[in-house]
Amino acid sequence: MKLAVYGKGGIGKSTSSCNISIALATRGKKVLQIGADPKHDSTFALTGFLIPTIMDTLQSKDYHYEEIWPEDIIYQGYGGVDCVEAGGPPAGAGCGGFVVGETTKLLKELNSFYEYDVILFDVLGDVVCGGFPAPLNYADYCLIVTDNGFDALFAANRIAASVREKARTHPLRLAGLVGNRTSKRDLIDKYVESCPMPVLEVLPLIEEIRVSRVKGKTLFEMTETDSSLNYVCQYYLNIADQLLAEPEGVVPKEVADRELFSLLSDFYHREASFTPQEGVVDSFLLV
């Protein structure tokens, strides 16, 4: 199974990806996580450090693939999850899609691409050009991380459009949304009414999730010294179980931009008309 995790920049994709990878490994699967972001910090919570990128390694070998071995690019992280960082082109030059393609090409040449039960691509922020959705060319499922805010759902809608486009050429499906760092889900529910798709899980605002990222650890590793965090791991295990059940998924039909803007902003304005005493949180302004 190959998964591609997308979402608005800063929404918590890498933290979610690392914990989902561990959850899948906990279920007995051999997992490879590929960071597909020039920041090359996708696997930081699994390894505890910034591992060398494939692009760095290729450049150091003058792009002689035959001189590269699996141990040069694959690092084992917590829980036995293997980790690769694709890296990216220099700022303002090159294409992220090319980097993903080179990463996949190298892993295939090393006979490593097909050794895993699950390969998870953790992909950079928004879909704004043909290069960013490149991991969808290799994925069976796309997973979108969002929150209950306007901007994240607007980005999710663009990603949904990209899934629909890529599904024309191979059997790609959208597994669903994962709500992250949100105490409410009303805006998420409003969106999926207009663009039907599963909501696999909604994680509330949990400070320890943010802290885990800073510490370079997953929640699963933190539970070794603080068993009170076991309940947080259950969110990720639930997501893993749904993915391992090989859901049918959907080929989404995105909402037109202007229609979505009207839908979400009108909903926000209706909520904002209530008084603070009624417990309404202005999630739009918190994004």
UniProtKB/Swiss-Prot annotation:
GO biological processes: light-independent chlorophyll biosynthetic process; photosynthesis, dark reaction
GO cellular component: chloroplast
Domain of life: Eukaryota
Co-factor remark: Binds 1 [4Fe-4S] cluster per dimer.
Cofactor annotation: [4Fe-4S] cluster
Compartment annotation: Plastid, Chloroplast
CDD domains the UniProt entry points to: Bchl-like (cd02032)
Pathway connected to this protein: Porphyrin-containing compound metabolism; chlorophyll biosynthesis (light-independent)
UniProt keyword terms in alphabetical order: 4Fe-4S, ATP-binding, Chlorophyll biosynthesis, Chloroplast, Iron, Iron-sulfur, Magnesium, Metal-binding, Nucleotide-binding, Oxidoreductase, Photosynthesis, Plastid
Residue sites binding ATP per the record: 10-15, 39, 180-181
Catalyzed reaction equations: chlorophyllide a + oxidized 2[4Fe-4S]-[ferredoxin] + 2 ADP + 2 phosphate = protochlorophyllide a + reduced 2[4Fe-4S]-[ferredoxin] + 2 ATP + 2 H2O
InterPro entries: NifH/chlL_CS (IPR030655), NifH/frxC (IPR000392), P-loop_NTPase (IPR027417), Protochlorophyllide_ATP-bd (IPR005971)
Pfam families: Fer4_NifH (PF00142)
GO molecular function: 4 iron, 4 sulfur cluster binding; ATP binding; metal ion binding; oxidoreductase activity, acting on iron-sulfur proteins as donors; oxidoreductase activity, acting on the CH-CH group of donors, iron-sulfur protein as acceptor
Subunit-structure text: Homodimer. Protochlorophyllide reductase is composed of three subunits; ChlL, ChlN and ChlB.
Function: Component of the dark-operative protochlorophyllide reductase (DPOR) that uses Mg-ATP and reduced ferredoxin to reduce ring D of protochlorophyllide (Pchlide) to form chlorophyllide a (Chlide). This reaction is light-independent. The L component serves as a unique electron donor to the NB-component of the complex, and binds Mg-ATP.
Protein's name according to its UniProt entry: Light-independent protochlorophyllide reductase iron-sulfur ATP-binding protein
Organism: Nephroselmis olivacea
